[in-house]
């Protein structure tokens, strides 16, 4: 949950100065779930908008100060709908207890609902500018940190716990080898060549994964430092790489779990919790590898993306 809370503070840093003064004027950081799916409707009124909707996946909402929610609202020209993110105090939102899951239980990602809540204009931000790294906050702060493209940053930050989970799963498997004996003998599994092969392969995969995550982080930061808007093709490529990192994290955890024997399934064994958490995390929409690859393939063929990148 910590990484989600961190990246949501970063998201708020992409807003204009007035919104950031509302949020950070009295404290240096806050907790705010970000439910960006267009599940709400925002009606323009004098001085702002009236927002109504219900959103899933409110990570951190049980400890929240504010909520960030996505809603459709008429464009300036009035001829289309645009997806915007609205910031609302938690006191004006309803938290609905829905988070009964096998993994990531501690995030408390319950549903969020608001009904006809007034949101001043400065607490609204068009998501399109945030995706490309061309937000008001990027211009306000003038640093590479806030000029990075949004979706790769969100994916990269959320991927870090998956990689950490994979590395920890391998470490737990290694510890278990010195404790388990071959069935019907006193020979420790740590003495068996097959165990050496499994451990070497799992550790090598986990090390390669960590190196890849760091390289993608450098690539994302480089776009922030470039002073250029990150193009769709590059954003799509980064999302494919991040999705592949999380999928490999999931597979490493699965393989370590399978190799650790039946004891790994006891509820007091941390390996089964890592297994549940990483498998649940891998299903997050930002890691949808099929969708990411589709967009990347379309852009490589000079076709327009048909989903956000």
Question: Where would I find each of the regions flagged by the language model?
Answer:
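Glycine-rich flavin
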Residues: 1-64
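Short Gly/Pro-enriched turn/cap motifs at secondary-structure boundaries
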Residues: 30-33, 101-105
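Buried hydrophobic positions in well-ordered alpha/beta secondary-structure cores of metabolic enzymes
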Residues: 51-53, 114, 166, 209, ...
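DPxDG-like acidic metal-binding loop motif
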Residues: 54-93, 97-98
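Glycine-rich beta->alpha junctions and the first turn(s) of the following alpha-helix
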Residues: 102-103, 109-206
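Generic structural signal for well-ordered, non-transmembrane alpha-helical segments
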Residues: 164, 171, 200-207, 243-250, ...
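C-terminal helix-coil-helix/basic helical segment that borders enzyme active sites and/or dimer interfaces
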Residues: 208-244, 254-265
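Glycine-rich phosphate/cofactor-binding loops in nucleotide/flavin-utilizing enzymes
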Residues: 260-309
